[in-house]
């Protein structure tokens, strides 16, 4: 069975989950769940494989995998967010929020990779990320400024609206990551 194969060969679990996600998306969650039960160590690989094969399923599958193996998934969230954002920028903000819900401490890293892969979604992703982890405002701002400077002003505005107390951290994070962008950012925030 697929579960037995997943137990024996963790790489197979990712391939099976990806194949099902592509061929029969409605069955992907059940299959991924049984594969991860058979081999919890493969949880992150399963989630990453599904993200590549069927980006629109990545958030739900990753949440399921986080319930099975939270430690492995905590380390995989930025990679999954990057994969989905690259495949479909329209999903970038949603996947950023979903991944930060799994590992709030990765909010800065997620901002960095999503901004790099889908700069047009960077500001919206930043807003989703600060909802998941308001304390990471500076790190989120830095990630956007470093990878998508053209989105920095919009992102800063969204971040300050979400967490006004973090305004200094937001501008500071952006200034550290991209000094050239910070004048525009400060100006936008004062408007």
Stretches with model-predicted labels:
Residues 1-191:
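General marker for long, soluble alpha-helical cores
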């Amino acid at each position: 069975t697929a579960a037995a194969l997943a137990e024996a060969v963790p790489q197979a679990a990712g391939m099976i989950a990806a194949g099902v996600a592509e061929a029969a998306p409605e069955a992907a969650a059940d299959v991924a769940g049984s594969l991860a039960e058979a081999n919890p160590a493969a949880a992150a690989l399963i989630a990453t494989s599904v993200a590549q094969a069927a980006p629109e399923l990545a958030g739900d599958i990753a949440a399921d995998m986080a319930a099975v193996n939270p430690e492995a998934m905590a380390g995989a969230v930025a990679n999954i967010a990057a994969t989905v954002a690259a495949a479909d920028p329209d999903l970038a903000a949603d996947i950023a929020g979903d991944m930060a819900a799994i590992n709030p401490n990765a909010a800065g890293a997620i901002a960095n990779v999503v901004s790099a892969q889908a700069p047009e979604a960077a500001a919206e992703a930043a807003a989703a990320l600060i909802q998941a982890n308001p304390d990471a405002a500076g790190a989120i701002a830095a990630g956007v400024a470093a990878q998508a400077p053209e989105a920095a002003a919009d992102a800063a505005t969204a971040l300050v609206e979400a967490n006004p107390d973090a305004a200094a951290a937001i501008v500071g994070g952006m200034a550290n990551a991209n000094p050239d962008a910070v004048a525009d950012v400060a100006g936008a925030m004062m408007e």
